[in-house]
Amino acid sequence: MTRVTPLDKLRVPIGGQEIELQQIDYDGGGISLLRTRIREKSRFTVFEIDPQTAELWGRALLRWAQAQEPA
């Protein structure tokens, strides 16, 4: 049975989307994946990424956030 572990849940203040992060561990073992679920009203976007992609994406998000003017 696939194991799903909730990691975090966020709500975007502008737009109201819900972002849910989960760790996915499959029965057969191997690599764990990060599932990202974005809910926009009744529409869902779901994708799973490997640790290396998650690290690159996370760094890109941090670079962008740090370059923004404080609110």
Residue spans of the language-model regions?
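Positively charged, low-complexity terminal tracts
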Residues: 1-71
